[in-house]
Amino acid sequence: MELKNKVSNLPSKPGCYLYLNKDKHVIYVGKAKNLKKRVSSYFDRAQNLKTTRLVREIADLEYFVVSNEKESLLLEENLIKKYRPKYNVLLNDDKAYPYIIITNEKDPTYKYVRKLDKKAFRSFGPLPIGSNARETLITLQRLFPLRRCKGNLGKPCLHYFIGQCSGACFKEVNKEYYQEQIKRVDNFFKGNINEVKTLLTNQMHKAAENLQFEEAQRIKEQIISLDFTTTKQNVEFKSQTDVDVISYFIEDEKIAIVTLFYRSGKLLFKDEHIQLYFEQDITDLIDSFMSQIYDKNILPDKIIVDNEVELFDLNEKYKSISTHPIKEDEKIIYKLATENAQEAIRKSKISTTINIGNENELLLELQEKANLQKEPYRLEMFDISNIGNEFIVGSCVVYINGKPARNEFRKYNIESKFTSDYDRLKEMLYRRFQKALIEKRMLPDLIIMDGGIIQIHAAKEIINALGLSEIQVIGLVKDEHHNTSFLIDTNEEQVIIKDKPKLFNWLSSIQVRVDEYAKSGFRKKQNNSFLKSDLEQIEGLGKKRIQDLFKKFNTINEIESADQEELFKILKNKKALDNLNIYLKNRK
């Protein structure tokens, strides 16, 4: 049935609709109280005003009828997670922001989490990603000690001896002690950090007097790293409440959505999201954005959104806490959020102009240069990094519609006995695509191998064996200086790409990214290997327990900041844990 007839025959019932392009990729998922009315509005709007980018790409549609709006909301969220359409609001996995929590126990402890524990006694955050949140956790553990061991050990733990545990390991700790410590932590996160700075400064001077200069420098860096929570704000809320302010700015088929996170009236941090815009309903768009944010993060006391956003549906979902800017301070801060969204669009334009250009143009150029049968909406590039036969790590970077999809990047530990890159590549590619088939994940339109004919043949051997011969394969070859040189197309012929500067720079950036991603995995594996050798000297650990530690924790710093109960669950041996604690203490 033709698309026009499908639209005219849609039912006037609630449901979800999916738009597909000519390659049968789902490019947009939406929900509607009335399917016929909503879907028809897209095409009517396109004829009456202008043909939007989305409408130009729609080749087919599918739909699901549901009983009510609540069902359509849940279905829409699941379909977006499944297909990750390029025209929907798609937030990366890193939108699960870090939090520091205090557990709700008789003897509470601190924890650093990404997945919120709703049973926590206190939750502090969300904290900016890359904000030294773990350093802040260590600072709190040292200055305002709660329980830092399993508790009820019958004798003081190591952390108690160095003043970093409440003593729940060997004695009854009164409730008033914890109340006082938590009150001091509350004050710290409200921006009252004079006490913290004084304590740290005293520790720094003491370390310097004892000629412990490395320790003094580390404490100094801790003091500096606390600034992200306490920077003096030019604009603050008069009330001491938690407020999120969500604004947006639209220009040239792009929308920037900016969220300002205020905690206890002070701006904690700002988050930006930019994507394509095609005149979709702004309430639906903000609703979808909020669904993904608050699916993984704590709801504040209030959410302020634009006057254009209808509040009825939002307040049904978010407990009547959504509002338009009404008070004077709310209007001022909302204006600030809008200005930040405008600036995000401006920076995006500059970045696009300088670095690459229009992604669609690049994909079309690549299609032509590499002799591809279709435009590569999704491409995956593979590389391997190693020293001889040690620390072998494979990497895969994924680009969707010309942009990196970082949450889909993957590293592969290559443990096989093969000594040739050809066989190692085959192992990585087999694992990658066998799993994709089993889990019914989206497959790439194009595979780019970091290398030449040998690497291309390794890829073709695997995809043909798995019945995936429709996936196209090309190679990107480096020169003797390890810089991008030329492309090998689908006919396995060399193609010069330097005559297309934007395409060349873009492909070169992908090659650098996959190379660095592989090397980062290799370096981590190498460092962990050296560290594991060091840890093997600790009595009671052994290779198996060390492997178990590194399955749970990525670095020695994460092991150091873990609570004792968590470490004991892994080691299952008190003497091994005691020896590990002594090692961690002595390495500082």
Curated annotation (Swiss-Prot):
Residues 12-89 form the GIY-YIG domain. CDD domains: GIY-YIG_UvrC_Cho (cd10434). Keywords: Cytoplasm, DNA damage, DNA excision, DNA repair, Excision nuclease, SOS response. Its main location: cytoplasm. SUPFAM superfamilies: C-terminal UvrC-binding domain of UvrB, GIY-YIG endonuclease, RuvA domain 2-like. It comes from the Bacteria. Residues 194-229 form the UVR domain. GO terms for cellular component: cytoplasm; excinuclease repair complex. It holds the Pfam family GIY-YIG. GO terms for biological process: nucleotide-excision repair; SOS response. It is found in: Cytoplasm. GO terms for molecular function: DNA binding; excinuclease ABC activity. Belongs to the UvrC family. The UvrABC repair system catalyzes the recognition and processing of DNA lesions. UvrC both incises the 5' and 3' sides of the lesion. The N-terminal half is responsible for the 3' incision and the C-terminal half is responsible for the 5' incision. Interacts with UvrB in an incision complex. This is UvrABC system protein C. The lineage of its organism: Bacteria, Bacillati, Mycoplasmatota, Mollicutes, Entomoplasmatales. The gene is uvrC.
